[in-house]
């Protein structure tokens, strides 16, 4: 989940403006206004994916009530922060995506704490998240930097496509070079055995 959710969410976040300008060229002002929201909602997507994965782990170990409790906690935080931020003239509607991000971050943190306490095989979170986070940070930097260079020689709305391609290549190369992708990760994909052999995964 982290190998897919992290780059997808980070990519949406760092290239929010360019992506929206590409999709909605006829309304640049609206696209620019929405970019702020997508910056936070892109990050929220990461935690939505992690929430689903951690909920599944807890349910598999017979702790079905914990995801319900953590979801309620996240919902309460969302309501409170939404009320405070959207009601503040300084932030107004811009507070909505921020409160959404807070909501899912809290849910995931509580789920991870519950997994560490309830699952017999204590998960090594540092080992699980360190490499994907490092690779994603480099990928996000590559995406933003390459867009900044490309936009000087290409129309703004088209510079985002090669920037995304560069980010995908950077992420893929680093994931393989640092061993973040294993044979077990690939084997479940269609033609996974063949892909694993081509990539020399063990």
Residue ranges of model-derived segments:
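Residue-level hotspots within the lipid-embedded alpha helices of multi-pass solute transporters
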Residues: 5-10, 41-49, 71-75, 101-105, ...
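Interfacial segments at transmembrane-helix termini and the short loops linking adjacent helices
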Residues: 12-45, 90, 94
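Membrane-interface junctions at transmembrane-helix termini in multi-pass inner-membrane proteins
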Residues: 39, 43-73, 83-84
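Membrane-embedded alpha-helical segments of multi-pass transporters/permeases
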Residues: 9-17, 22, 40, 79, ...
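Alpha-helical transmembrane segments
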Residues: 54-62, 112-128, 181
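Membrane-interface helix-loop junctions in multi-pass transport and translocation proteins
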Residues: 65, 72-113, 123, 141, ...
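Short alpha-helical transmembrane segments in multi-pass integral membrane proteins
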Residues: 1-14, 23-27, 77-78, 93-119, ...
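Membrane-proximal transmembrane or re-entrant/amphipathic helices at the cytosolic face
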Residues: 144-202
């Amino acid at each position: 989940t982290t190998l897919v959710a992290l780059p997808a969410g980070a990519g949406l976040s760092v290239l929010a403006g360019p992506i929206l300008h590409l999709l909605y060229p006829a309304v640049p002002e609206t696209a620019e206004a929405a970019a702020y929201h997508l910056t936070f909602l892109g990050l929220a997507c990461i935690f939505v994916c992690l929430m689903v994965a951690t909920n599944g782990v807890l349910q598999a170990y017979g702790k079905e009530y914990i995801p319900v409790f953590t979801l309620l906690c996240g919902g309460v935080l969302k309501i409170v922060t939404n009320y405070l931020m959207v009601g503040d003239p300084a932030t107004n509607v811009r507070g909505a995506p921020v409160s959404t991000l807070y909501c899912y971050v809290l849910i995931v943190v509580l789920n991870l704490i519950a997994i560490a306490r309830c699952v017999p095989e204590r998960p090594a979170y540092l080992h699980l998240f360190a490499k994907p986070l490092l690779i994603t940070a480099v990928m996000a930097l590559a995406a933003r930097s390459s867009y900044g260079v490309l936009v000087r020689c290409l129309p703004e709305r088209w510079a985002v496509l090669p920037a995304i391609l560069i980010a995908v290549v950077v992420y893929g190369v680093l994931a393989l070079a640092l061993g973040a992708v294993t044979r077990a990760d690939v084997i479940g994909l269609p033609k996974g055995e063949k892909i694993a052999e081509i990539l020399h995964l063990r």
